[in-house]
Amino acid sequence: MRYTRGAVWAGLAAVALAGTAGCGAQTTRAGEAVGRAGAIMAALGRATDRTDSLGSAEVRMSTELKGAAPIAMEGTYSWGDGYAYDVEMDTKAAKMETLTRSPSIRTLLVDGAYYYDTDPQPSGPLKGKEWMKVDASAVFGDKGAQALTGTSGAGSPAAIMRGLRYASDVRDLGRQTVDGKRATHYRAVIDKNHLGRAKEALASGDDTLFGSVTGGADSITMDVWVGAGDLPVRLKEVIGTMTVTMDFEKFGATADVKAPPAAQTGDVTELMKKAAARQ
């Protein structure tokens, strides 16, 4: 299964890394941030509270990795009771044609594990299986995965918004139109030393998929466009050599996301770890 590392990472990158800044950011910086830019932080605080309270959203997403074509995804995100998602992504862009003949591949995140709706394979751990499973530890390493999955909602859009409260160099870039909606554009930089437990993920070495693909990151640059009703219209994160952009189509009232039946699932976590270690 030499294809597994590159194929799975392309899909994971779009969502596994989005929002790492939001997990456990150190709250001791809140007072400093408000003192520096009270009006901006108040606006972001309102947007955070609104996003957090709604608990889910329908989204469209694009991930760009250096030297690769953008990967488009769309579906539902949920963060009301832990972080989960159910999305469809372009099979060809994600380089997963060897795993499914479908032009799009359904991808789930449930309880810190990623599931891909693949075609049953003739041999190996996916023989006769409908789903491929990859644990977050294969992406971020064991410590990084614990940091990201140990907090309710870690990695979700609401967590991203919370991280903005503790950023340095927060700027109001004015009113713009994005995705056909009028919104105020804010930009912030969060240093990894102010990410709390999430810095374990950013500290991942080259022996993890995160480190080998993004080159690691000392900070995250985040842009958010806040529109009507104090809700985000778009979020954008730059993490190392990766850029993730998320557009919100509708908030609230999405279906629960559940893991596939264990009998239909093949776990390739250890294969992914070994492949990353060989890079």
Located regions from the model:
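Subset-of-secretome marker
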Residues: 2-6, 23-279
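Sec-dependent bacterial lipoprotein signal peptides
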Residues: 1-21
